[in-house]
Amino acid sequence: MKWVKSGVGILGILLIICHAVTSQRRILDITDNLKITFKTISNFGPRAQSIQNVTIENVGIKDIPDFGWRCYFCHDQLLFPGTFNLARSQYFLRPILDNYVVLSDGFLLEFIKGCMYRITPIPRNAPIKTRDKREFTLLAEQFSVSKYDSFPNWYCETISGGNTEVANIRSTENLKYVEDFDSSYNWFRIPHDFRSVPLQPQDRYSANHKASSVEECKYKVIPTPVKASVRKVQRNFGTTVYYGTTDTSIRGKLFKVAEKLALKHKLGLVEMTPGQPVNNGISLVVTGNYIERNIPSPDEAYRLSVSADLISIEAPALPGLINGIETMHSLSAWDMALPYGGVKDFPRFPFRGIFLDIASNFPGYNYMMKFLTVMAQYKLNKLVLPLYNNEGFRLELNDSPGYEFQALHLVGGNRCHDLKEENCLFSQLGSFAGNSDGYLTKGDMVDLIKTADLLNIEIIMSLNIGESARGAIVPLKTSKHNRLLYDPEDTDFVDRFYPQKDSSMNPCREETMIFYDHMLKQLKAIYKAASVPLKTIMIGSKVNFDQVLNSKYCYPKNLNSTQRLMERENLERNINGFKLNFTKRLVKTAHDNGINEVMAIDDVFTTEFDAAGNTPNTVYDTVDSETNKTRFNATVTAVHSRYDTVRDERLWKRGDRFAELGYKVIISPPILDFNYAVEPDPDRPGDYDSVIRNISFSKLFRFVPDSHCCNIPNAIQHDCALESDCTTAGPPDSYIGTLGKLDTRKLRSLKDWNELLFPRLLIFAERSWHKSSWEDSFEPHRVRMNNITRQIITNYTVPNWNDIIQEESKVLGCISRKEKLRLMHEDGLKPYVEPPGARLLGGNTMRIAASTTEDSFWVQASVNGNPWTDNVKVLDVNPTDSVRLRTVHPAKAELRSKEVKLNLTSLPTPREQFRKIAQDALSRRIGIDIQRARMPPMPVNPTYRPPVPLPSFDPADDRAPDLAAIAAAHPPPLPPGMPPHMMPNMPFPPRPPFVPPLLPPGQMRALGQQAGQALRGQGQQTGQQTLPAQPRGPMGLTGQAAGTGVAGQSGQQPSAAGQGTQQGLPGQQRTGVVPGQWPFFPGMPAAQFPPMFNPQMQRALQMRGQGQIPQTQGAVAGAGQSRVPQQQAG
């Protein structure tokens, strides 16, 4: 009998195993054989939406059934916004289609959470037969001009007998499934967007590039010292490191710094008394005496001298000594020998920081160690780490086995396919379907803090106590303790780009402050374990006030509907008082935990729009005007990062208002966002928005930290605003530094991180440490009136371009020649390398000339797939040849650029053709052909032409204004759905005028017809079909309420500002385009042109006429006015 029972048991086990194998084989039959293709067709779809096409092909030998499976993918934008019910956070057409959009070819689309969507085949439709293709079209809320807007690792699941199997779709493991961007329809974000056109080799060619020499770069230190004098005579490091100090409190730390230096160069180590004569080595002395007193950071100053007898580094404090050691390493990097001479140096700012987003995508402990080393090399001294955001929680707060909140890192630090999110956060941002991602252990963080302390780097933790906090909220709600930090009865709408109510902490729940206090205590314990004091904390996001107004926790209990309405009205009137009290409580809690410095994004310390006339430009005073007492019992620092315009409020003015009202100010304008692309290349990593397409090396080099009227994106010239749009500068010592930022939501690999960070991090370090003489030539533009003609004239200031270009050429040249090799050799980090340029030479034979802006690099060429030819200057080719080029370092073959293909025709490149359009436009014909065909002449001035300040324009020249800004600021917006350069009554063309055909005419014609159907089909509500056998609508859409909106929505919801990000700094949204209007472009005086050419002015006049804009502005209690007499802060 026993053997019978045993046999039954074995049979059961075998059946289970067979079922598991069968299920796994079934899912692999689907995921291995589904070929996904994704294509952005046009960014000029209905209501300025992006039209995107998805093709699903069965490349296997078996049919794929139409039931039993469904697939998931991440999309960074809201899809089909016209049919999305924000209040319910789901699609809604009618009850039978609740939460679905019916796509063509038999699929349903469903929003899940975060960026995740699910497509499900409609049962009884038809299986996908071998070599069969299914297509459907997506409408995305914003434009898309990069492959990196898409995410890899689509995956599918099968459900059989209650068991779920998941597997990644093999064809989407990288971004090769995204088709090329190949015309102005998917290059352009808005009409006239010439700077978004990708560069061709002909556009890069520079026949007169002045390369830096070895002698110029051999002893070039980046960042540039204040004073340096070196000679060609050299010496080695000697035999011993001597160290000494009169300050016994730092003796142990000085020993560790000296020991690290001795081990690196294999030298002896001897402690000495300051003043003791030594020779044949390196002398490290902390004197305690200031080298310079009237400088922002005297402790970081140092003096380095090199003679035949000794290498001497002296500093008043340990930070300066560490800076001196890094300068010594830079001087000796070329051949491990030091030149005779001396350096005297100190920084322009005490705060030179990087905000590194480790929460969205986790880089790992080893990478962070390398990053600290690079920061020290280039004298950056603050590292801000967001511990969590919507995408993850990245720190083990406590390693005790019984720690009650282990779910924070165990759930928040991992992603997998778990819809209930009990074991991990739901898969997102292209993560694998299986468990992926990671977090720092407590021991890892202790090591990082210790290492940073010896490198003169302070690690500052950023906490999101407000929006963008889902990585902390979800683990706590799913843990056994069930700590809710939000209101589960609230509506789902919290953030348009993250439509889930559990992504924002509720300030009215006491659990939120308990969590915040717990985080501070745990962090303090971690710093204590590293023997480093926790001095500073950062608040990385503001409160979501939609949540405050809707949550029951923000009102007294047991209110009837009338009382609740009255309380809501009172709260809405006093919302800025509520915000101030919550901010004060955050600062007080930090101070109570022994933290005396609190940083926060600028929105935390400013008001919201209210009936009293307060705006985001109204800054809370640090002193209470009624009691004359300090509001905050800790030092408060505002990270000034918003330089956009909201309802005609110029937010770049806030920096001076912070300084005037007692805050320390760190400037962090958009030009310091390293997540922006290096160049407008759809194939390379990097983000963008409607204002900034890319930030080049030259653009970043011209960053002027001391100018409070410049560094403003898309100001009409040189990123400087009008003098009237600038405020009186606050106390100079209130501006304490700069903060660069890297948002990693779209960066799936460390290769992408490195490409965006390096070498731009070095340029940022140069501007943050060293002030160049030409910086003062960046000034605001001045407006005056001609007393005779009464005409308003703008005098545009011109920077000192000769000095700028000369210094830029030397610094960027030495970065290529020396620093990129240092990054590869010493740190193992591969920086971005610019591709080469080339052009066709005239003559009887076809020849090409090649060049590169990367000093000491070669151009390599491959013809028809043959091996690469080194150091190409001139190359003979045939017209039918396929020529590929790349830039490569002769000593480091892995240090190379992407490959580019050279078009062997004499036709101008798209950029060259657009340059001609731009030159015509700048001849005071901006939009003339389009405008005259579209609208009658103006009755007041039929010959009017919008003003243009510069006589010439080159789309690749950062010094010139952006024509997209000019064209968008002046003409009325184009009708929705109108592609660039369209005339009325024209059919949708196979390509825009002036753009060479980049596809065969047949394909382009089909593309045009397909998009034309979409445009003509708008306004038809097609959601009246039944589920089985869905007929195909325009552009392959069914179930899309395109024109009128649904479920109580009046039309399509207006687009929120920017493509969504919860991490810019966290909680900050990038500037975007609202359908039907253009962003404000500073520096364009409104009085120079009629209102109809300026949508902002027209809208403002209409609002004032309707009484929506008050003539006088009041101030909320607690919203401070400037204490500078001639300047108001309201």
Swiss-Prot record:
Per the record, the pathway is: Glycan degradation; chitin degradation
Could you say which EC number(s) this protein's record lists? 3.2.1.52
- Molecular function per GO: beta-N-acetylhexosaminidase activity; polysaccharide binding
Tissue spec: Prismatic layer of shell (at protein level). Expressed primarily in the mantle with highest level in the mantle edge and lower level in the mantle pallium.
Please classify the protein's predominant subcellular localization into one broad category: secreted
Q: Which GO terms describe its cellular component?
A: extracellular region; membrane
- Per UniProt, the ranges with Low complexity bias are 1001-1030, 1037-1072
From what superkingdom does this record's organism come?
A: Eukaryota
Leader peptide range in chain numbering: 1-23
Subcellular location(s): the record lists: Secreted
Annotated family: Belongs to the glycosyl hydrolase 20 family.
| Name under which the protein is recorded | Putative beta-hexosaminidase
Q: Which organism is it from?
A: Pinctada maxima
